[in-house]
């Protein structure tokens, strides 16, 4: 059994609900472009980053939560007024962040296994 909880959500409302149901826990969130029926995201950087991020998940802190969030279709994501950009201040996908902290890896930073591991292991 994993030492962390993984939650898969789609869209801003589901993300907020997942966070509110886990108040007080150490939450890591990974934001990716939506996947199609074949499981491939419209975002090429997300396709590159996902196996790297998943490869470091064994380093997640005991009892933490990993939320995998699909941000929506490309047209929704590109709209500068979408809730992810307005409220969470996301600037690109993929983004990996430690919720409630300034710690954030954006786009190509998510390709670097050492940076991902540091985020999962540093307080």
UniProtKB/Swiss-Prot annotation:
<feature type="disulfide bond" description="Redox-active">
    <location>
        <begin position="43"/>
        <end position="46"/>
    </location>
</feature>
<keyword id="KW-0963">Cytoplasm</keyword>
<comment type="similarity">
    <text>Belongs to the thioredoxin family.</text>
</comment>
<feature type="site" description="Contributes to redox potential value">
    <location>
        <position position="44"/>
    </location>
</feature>
<keyword id="KW-1015">Disulfide bond</keyword>
<feature type="domain" description="Thioredoxin">
    <location>
        <begin position="41"/>
        <end position="123"/>
    </location>
</feature>
<feature type="active site" description="Nucleophile">
    <location>
        <position position="43"/>
    </location>
</feature>
<dbReference type="Pfam" id="PF06110">
    <property type="entry name" value="TXD17-like_Trx"/>
</dbReference>
<protein>
    <recommendedName>
        <fullName>Thioredoxin domain-containing protein 17</fullName>
    </recommendedName>
</protein>
<keyword id="KW-0676">Redox-active center</keyword>
<dbReference type="InterPro" id="IPR010357">
    <property type="entry name" value="TXNDC17_dom"/>
</dbReference>
<dbReference type="GO" id="GO:0004601">
    <property type="term" value="F:peroxidase activity"/>
</dbReference>
<feature type="site" description="Contributes to redox potential value">
    <location>
        <position position="45"/>
    </location>
</feature>
<dbReference type="GO" id="GO:0005829">
    <property type="term" value="C:cytosol"/>
</dbReference>
<comment type="function">
    <text>Disulfide reductase. May participate in various redox reactions through the reversible oxidation of its active center dithiol to a disulfide and catalyze dithiol-disulfide exchange reactions. Has peroxidase activity and may contribute to the elimination of cellular hydrogen peroxide. May function as an antioxidant involved in response to viral infection.</text>
</comment>
<dbReference type="InterPro" id="IPR036249">
    <property type="entry name" value="Thioredoxin-like_sf"/>
</dbReference>
<dbReference type="GO" id="GO:0047134">
    <property type="term" value="F:protein-disulfide reductase [NAD(P)H] activity"/>
</dbReference>
<dbReference type="InterPro" id="IPR045108">
    <property type="entry name" value="TXNDC17-like"/>
</dbReference>
<feature type="active site" description="Nucleophile">
    <location>
        <position position="46"/>
    </location>
</feature>
């Amino acid at each position: 059994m994993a030492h962390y909880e993984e939650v898969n959500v789609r869209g801003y409302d589901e993300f907020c609900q997942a966070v509110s149901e886990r108040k007080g826990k150490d939450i890591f969130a990974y934001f990716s472009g939506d996947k199609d029926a074949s499981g491939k995201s419209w975002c090429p950087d997300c396709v590159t980053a996902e196996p790297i991020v998943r490869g470091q998940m064994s380093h997640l802190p005991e009892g933490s939560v990993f939320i995998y969030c699909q941000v929506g279709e490309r047209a929704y994501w590109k709209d500068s007024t979408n809730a992810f950009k307005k409220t969470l201040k996301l600037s690109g996908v993929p983004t990996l962040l430690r919720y409630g902290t300034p710690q954030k890896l954006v786009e190509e930073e998510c390709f670097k296994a050492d940076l991902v591991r540091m985020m999962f292991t540093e307080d």
